[in-house]
């Protein structure tokens, strides 16, 4: 996190960050208004009041989908089976999207903000057990969370009869086994149950039939970290933070060959050009911007002409991409789009769960074709075949959203840089095809 002026009124997620980059432990967190939201909710509010405030605030999921958090909570609380047996809350901290590191920042530097958000959300959902599903490679984050959870227990924020409210909460930390597909909520639930991490068929949705058959809500780290400030400061304040129809702030960033790569908390509606030039300080000397991805490896490429778009769910979608995690990657003029997309598709192919045939067989086929094009050994119809494969991996034709997300960068790269892919067709084979066509025409 690069140093910028941060205050609680404008940077609710990051104002507590220390300049020395050390972790904010519970005593310091409490000195900076920590757990005041929890005390307010438990003493002054009913669970449904918390849900209504979060719904009115317009908070959307920060994991990439952008679904209304309050509505998601309402679906769980209104479920009939929910009234008979309690369910579970799961914090999705399995951050494995290439180029994304925002959740790691929140976990390692301000862990109690996340923990407070989890406890508040559990209270709103009337659940007594919550889980943090953490990426297995985040070893330092695991140690920090274990210590922070124990601190919260020692201070009486986790356990039985929290703050004399008759509300009980148990928080369990679970580390994953390195599967990207666990970012999908039902695959995560299967993994947490000890099963193979395959997505489930929906419906039933987790809000009805989730972890161990109980109603379950899965929320992202950044989403849950927003809850305390909303409860403490109110709906109007939260909405006024934004410059867009999407409310609040968002962790945004730029990586690639930029002078100052990083992540910053900025209002929704900040343009990509502002982030690139004012915060990332532009491209490195000798490089110019060729393309950029708005929010992770699984989002469509955009061009320099799109930099003036406000970074929010609606505007990025209208431009033909997705906001995703809002951590953008700059592609410089010296990068081969074929090589870049080849590496991206190799990742997605390797991370396929293998459950459905289009994804299991289609992605490796795409990788094989891209490898040939990268080595200038491509065949005449390779680019067309890539487009055909993409049509078979589009939304609605696979079991989950893994393959449709995987083909987004490929489709957009072909759309904007088709000549680079066509240049990978073997020249010798092209000349041979021309000769064959010439011979055939002479024979007619």
Swiss-Prot record:
UniProt superkingdom: Bacteria
Cofactor note: Binds 1 FMN.
Names of the cofactor(s): FMN; [4Fe-4S] cluster
NCBIfam families, per the entry: nuoF_fam (TIGR01959), PRK11278.1 (NF008436), PRK13596.1 (NF010120)
Gene Ontology molecular function, alphabetical: 4 iron, 4 sulfur cluster binding; FMN binding; metal ion binding; NAD binding; NADH dehydrogenase (ubiquinone) activity; quinone binding
Reactions this protein catalyses: a quinone + NADH + 5 H(+)(in) = a quinol + NAD(+) + 4 H(+)(out)
Entry binding sites for FMN: 176-223
Protein name: NADH-quinone oxidoreductase subunit F
Keywords: 4Fe-4S, Flavoprotein, FMN, Iron, Iron-sulfur, Metal-binding, NAD, Quinone, Translocase
Pfam families per record: Complex1_51K, NADH_4Fe-4S
EC numbers for this chain: 7.1.1.-
Organism: Buchnera aphidicola subsp. Acyrthosiphon pisum (strain APS)
Positions contributing to NAD(+) binding: 61-70
Function: NDH-1 shuttles electrons from NADH, via FMN and iron-sulfur (Fe-S) centers, to quinones in the respiratory chain. Couples the redox reaction to proton translocation (for every two electrons transferred, four hydrogen ions are translocated across the cytoplasmic membrane), and thus conserves the redox energy in a proton gradient.
Quaternary organization: Composed of 13 different subunits. Subunits NuoCD, E, F, and G constitute the peripheral sector of the complex.
Family: Belongs to the complex I 51 kDa subunit family.
InterPro entries referenced in this protein's UniProt entry, alphabetically: NADH-UbQ_OxRdtase_51kDa_CS, NADH-UbQ_OxRdtase_suF, Nuo51_FMN-bd, Nuo51_FMN-bd_sf, Nuop51_4Fe4S-bd, Nuop51_4Fe4S-bd_sf
Annotated residues for binding of [4Fe-4S] cluster: 353, 356, 359, 400
